[in-house]
């Protein structure tokens, strides 16, 4: 289940000024994501994925990208270094499930959660980030379970369940509408103590789930990457600054499956299809670059210093 992963080769006022004060609605998110969320739908709640959306995190606009760069550069200039911290992040797992006509859906076994933490630690080995399961709670709420992708339900769920988000990674499992596999908010999106922070996952994308080919636990790896400040590898397409990381080749659009040799931009390097921040199958992705590691470290130092 775990893999060997390799590394290739803030001010709050500004943060709040560059983003909205609350998340967009599901419809708004779809409109913002001009790179195309993947079109994934499920045959059934426990069926294989046919078509729909891989990740519900919209690409940030050019103004937000520039504002974040300015703030991160200011942190580095003030401190004189690129941070290289070892940070162990406590994980608070919130399992939301439903019971309908005597049938329980989404109350995942503890072994899936334990294995998910192992997958995260394998994926982030060498990045300076590690993860420890601090608690698991379980909540039966049919409305939250199926409505967690709507802004009002997400807000209710997180306000009720979140645990000290400045010092913990809160992960929620549910069954988002529209076949969404997961989402998170960038570190600059809100104050580090905001209940909005955390990761929301389709419950059966965890290791042991049935959402093949996205059921080895790397939806969580991908969304935690966003939580720590990474953009998609195809952010900006073939145009500078791309994903704001110098050692990930430009990529015109998201890759699916595992298309070896794919090369969609004229600049050097084939598409980074093995990178955790693309949209390929879980079995295909296995790496972060050293530039992405520096990006996560500086984003956390700038926007999540209490983590």
Predicted features by range, described:
Residues 9-19:
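Bacterial N-terminal signal peptides
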Residues 52-61, 147-149, 237-239, 257-259, ...:
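Sequence contexts marking disulfide-bonded cysteines in secreted/extracellular proteins
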Residues 99-109, 209-214, 283-284:
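Second-shell loop/turn segments in exported
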Residues 248-307:
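Metalloprotease/metallohydrolase-associated module, dominated by Zn2+-dependent proteases
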